[in-house]
C-alpha cells in the first residue's frame, strides 16, 4: 500500500518520537508490520480524523533507571507497536504506541 519513501518517512516520525520521549532506552529493531496487518489499525486513524494509518513493530532496551520511570528498568520490550496516522497524504503523526 505504501511506497518505500512513505514508510521511511514513518520511520523518521517514530525515531524522532522515540529519541524525545524514551530517554534511557535503546531501540534495537523497527519494522513495518506489513499491509495486511496495517489495515487492522485503521480505527486509530479514524479516531483522530485521519484517513491513513502506518504501523511499526519494535524492540527496545531500557536502562537501569527505567527510562523516564514509567518502564521496567533493565528490561527489553519486544513487539512494541507504533501507530502513525495522516490525512490526504500529509505528514505522519504519532497517535499511539504500546502493546
Regions found by a protein language model. Give the residues of each.
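Short beta-strand edge/turn micro-motifs at domain boundaries
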Residues: 77-99
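Flexible low-complexity loop/turn motifs enriched in small/helix-breaking residues
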Residues: 1-76
Amino acid at each position: 500500500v505504501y511506497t518505500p519513501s512513505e514508510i521511511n518517512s514513518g520511520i523518521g516520525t517514530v525515531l524522532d518520537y522515540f529519541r524525545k520521549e524514551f530517554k534511557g532506552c535503546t531501540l534495537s529493531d523497527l519494522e513495518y508490520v506489513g499491509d495486511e496487518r496495517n489495515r487492522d489499525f485503521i480505527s486509530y486513524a479514524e479516531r483522530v480524523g485521519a484517513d491513513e494509518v502506518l504501523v511499526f513493530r519494535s524492540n527496545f532496551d531500557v536502562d537501569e533507571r527505567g527510562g523516564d520511570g514509567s518502564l521496567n528498568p533493565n528490561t527489553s520490550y519486544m513487539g512494541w507497536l507504533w501507530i502513525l496516522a495522516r490525512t490526504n497524504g500529509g505528514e505522519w503523526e504519532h497517535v499511539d504506541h504500546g502493546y
